[in-house]
């Protein structure tokens, strides 16, 4: 039962209506009424506002006259807010009798414009307000939409209406319809059919909706109109409007008027190829459309492309105003304007997708200049009568010229030259008849079908029509005259060449079209293609991001091809790079023209390629006014497009950028794009697919058991003969090549295959093969050479460090190396397994430990062993005293690492880069820490970038960097124990020669407390001692030889000066006695010995050449080489320093541990507190009062 009504103020309060965007059926009351309601503690949910006003009464028929005005009422709820606007002057509203108050003293009631339109109020209307504080309540409401369009909108937003109806409507009435707001751009009108209990609104004419009320919506479907034959016609349009919208009248225009359709130029995959062979110039329509009165019984129709005035090209001043005109120059070829209306045969389209599309044959599309275009608006109507049979006896064909003809060629009519050949007139006519009468190409020959005056003929190679031509009907004075060539006898003549002058439909404001890719050319992005296609077909826009070489343009080409072939979208590509340097007004006009063109050819997908080149992101310390202006113009154009285009999926946007950060923030944050799809670098399986596609696809084993043959398209042949066949070695696994190319983009892989193929060609040329048809075998070594020195596009300009360290060079640290492998190598090696892992992978590690324990060496070795790029950072590289410079260095550093991913970013001496905040007088390190916290945020994660930090004082690092999500795990590089020291010595001894009798365990026992760097110093010092011993022994040999002893160097006395067995270590000048001098070697003696050695080398080369000439070169060279190698090995074995126990003892005496015992204990306590935990004692926060103490900035 309805409760008894309790009114607020009993008198009506005059007010003026003010329209505002409330988006509900509630009103804002004047401040005077609000004060009364607030003082009485009345809830806003219990208030119903009654608005009443007077309007002129409608005229009545008959002698009786009614009242001059009538009263209307509207009921609404209260928002709980007062009006903010001042009242306006009344416009066209009646005034209340006896009211003497001025407008300035009257309040303003604010109401939404859509709701006001439904109830009949306008801006400035004068109303009376009556408040109902305790109105009757209803718990069940039956509503129905006003129109079928309202029902369709409500059905589309049923869930939103269910959740938000009570927040928009509070009072219901039978007196006027109500408005519901279902989306930012759509509203629907409803009316109340019945309420329960039925007597709730009977006494007052309105009721309040209970909080738990049930709302029942009755559907309202469209009424199908019946044709005159009594059958129902589909709701789809038989004669579509300019934008391809459906018409309610399914019978089509009557009386033979024009009918409009949306064109699909053939060939098209939705069209059967067999049907296309039925005619040369013809159009295809659904059989149901052929039954409408305008087209019933028509065999031929006139076809015209409708061009809107706003998109028409500017008129050509060189052309005459009439249809046939010429140039002012007597020597220039004649210009004939083609006909805009062409008569074509009308045929049924059995598998038509709907009733609004029309298929245009290939030749007709070429004549109308809409070849390979979807979306043009075509007007067709029944063709008028043919020309009388006696009026036309000649058909003249005027070929198009490739260029301007000379005067002699223009005057010479007996011999004409086309396509590089001289054609006699009779021969040319016969050739034209032959090519235009072929039935195998177009199904029906051109000359046997409908021939329209000034019909454009296609370009036919190896004929006088090599550039196309135009057909003229001699004696035709009727505009758009035509004849049926198969029913007439006429004389075919070939006229002189003319200059082409064809009207162009503005199909694209950019001359650069998207690349046309063959089927299956792009691989590994099926998910992105399906996602983008589904989103675009649902009237949402997509932003495609990806680095250079990721295949954005190729992917866009595939997506637009799908939309064009399967969903009949018109594609409008715009290359933004071409407009990047244009004037702002030119860019704005380009946007306007693109939007207008897209609306005309809708549904349309507008492709903005390289949008970040036109609208880059705003940067610091630079003027970004131009970018912001263009971004605002772009956003306004898109918003105007969305608000003006009706119907789902009319115009959508597909844009490509390198990253969402590279484009202006107004574009990404302006609700322009519904979805952002990122093209990342392909994984290992994806790279394998790209490599297979690049080499032509793997095939089964062919005739050769060792190779699998692949025929590649257009390979660079070694000769001018047949193209060679590229063969892939059977043992070559492209998966291994994919594992070596981590981080490569598809474009990089394509270039890599080209480099490998070039290496194979070079190898084949160097092999001296005379077989012109020899197959090229692409092997692993070709890819190894191609990868060597190759820098992917994403890494060009990125400074990377290289390290020669490997696992074998590192001893000890077994557990630490294991964790590093798990963190860095396993996600790359076992990518499919980790892709399904639900846990977040570690991306940051802290290496801490005693100085000299191998932290830096471990970090440099892990990058090379795991196949990752390596960037090393020291403190001074990023610290800068200027405000903002250090933060920019950190940002640039992480951007470099992201560009080089997978990459290891190594911070050495991390405690100097990121100390605890609050203890820096300049604040530089504090800002660096804040920036690093932002870059290493655990919520976002670092994709492909691993952070390694090394320090010996982890207690000095800011604790925020050590939390999970940043530096997830800390690894201790402890002092080596006995086993670790043996392992370290074993790794170091690989590059040195130690006496076999010395055991590494003995050295390890004597080096307790030594770090890895100390052990390296011990061995290197011992190696230096061994080198000194070798040098001393050689000096002793030289000294003994100089004293006449038998040393290593001696000369055979019987051989003389011309025969040299070997060169001695010391050969001084001979004195008068003929004995070698024992004086110390001077610069002169050294020069003489060098000259003697050079002479001996020249004699050896001459002897070698002499033996080669004698025909015994190979054997002699081999014997000499073996003797030389043997002598070098013996000499090397004799001179190589060997570390013995004496050298090690000497080294141990001079080498001490780099870490003192006290320092080692102190560091042990620090590391123990870092692992176990710190005490709860915290500083008081007061600044230090000591002399020289630093005060905190926090």
UniProtKB/Swiss-Prot annotation:
Q: What is its EC number?
A: 3.6.4.-
- UniProt biased composition (Low complexity): 1116-1127
Q: Compositional bias (Polar residues) at which positions? A: 1066-1084
UniProt topology in membrane: Peripheral membrane protein
Q: Where is this region: AAA-cassette D1?
A: 538-730
Q: What happens when the gene is disrupted?
A: Leads to growth defects with sparse aerial hyphae, and reduced number of nuclei in hyphal cells. Also results in complete elimination of sporulation and trap formation and a remarkable decrease in the ability to trap nematodes. Leads to defective cell wall biosynthesis and increased stress susceptibility. Results in the up-regulation of the proteasome, membranes, ribosomes, DNA replication, and cell cycle functions, and the down-regulation of MAPK signaling and nitrogen metabolism.
- Note the SMART domains from the entry: AAA
Quickly give the catalysed reaction. ATP + H2O = ADP + phosphate + H(+)
Name the principal localization, coarsely classed: cytoplasm
Do the record's keywords include Hydrolase? yes
Q: Which GO terms describe its biological process?
A: protein import into peroxisome matrix
Task: Output compositional bias ranges, type Basic residues.
Answer: 221-234
- A single GO CC term, please? cytosol
Residue ranges of region Disordered? 220-255, 1062-1084, 1116-1139, 1174-1194
Which residues of this UniProt protein bind ATP? 546-553, 849-856
Q: Which domain of life is it from?
A: Eukaryota
Q: Where in the cell is it found?
A: Cytoplasm, Cytosol; Peroxisome membrane
Q: Could you tell me which Gene3D superfamilies the record lists for this protein?
A: 1.10.8.60, 3.10.330.10, P-loop containing nucleotide triphosphate hydrolases
| Region feature (AAA-cassette D2) | 844-1028
Q: What class of enzyme is it?
A: hydrolase
Q: Which UniProt keywords apply?
A: ATP-binding, Cytoplasm, Hydrolase, Membrane, Nucleotide-binding, Peroxisome, Peroxisome biogenesis, Protein transport, Repeat, Transport, Virulence
Main role? Component of the PEX1-PEX6 AAA ATPase complex, a protein dislocase complex that mediates the ATP-dependent extraction of the PEX5 receptor from peroxisomal membranes, an essential step for PEX5 recycling. Specifically recognizes PEX5 monoubiquitinated at 'Cys-6', and pulls it out of the peroxisome lumen through the PEX2-PEX10-PEX12 retrotranslocation channel. Extraction by the PEX1-PEX6 AAA ATPase complex is accompanied by unfolding of the TPR repeats and release of bound cargo from PEX5. Regulates autophagy and biogenesis of peroxisomes and Woronin bodies.
UniProt family annotation: Belongs to the AAA ATPase family.
The record's subunit annotation is: Interacts with PEX6; forming the PEX1-PEX6 AAA ATPase complex, which is composed of a heterohexamer formed by a trimer of PEX1-PEX6 dimers.
Q: Which PANTHER family match?
A: AAA-FAMILY ATPASE (PTHR23077), PEROXISOMAL ATPASE PEX1 (PTHR23077:SF12)
Any idea what this protein is called?
Peroxisomal ATPase PEX1
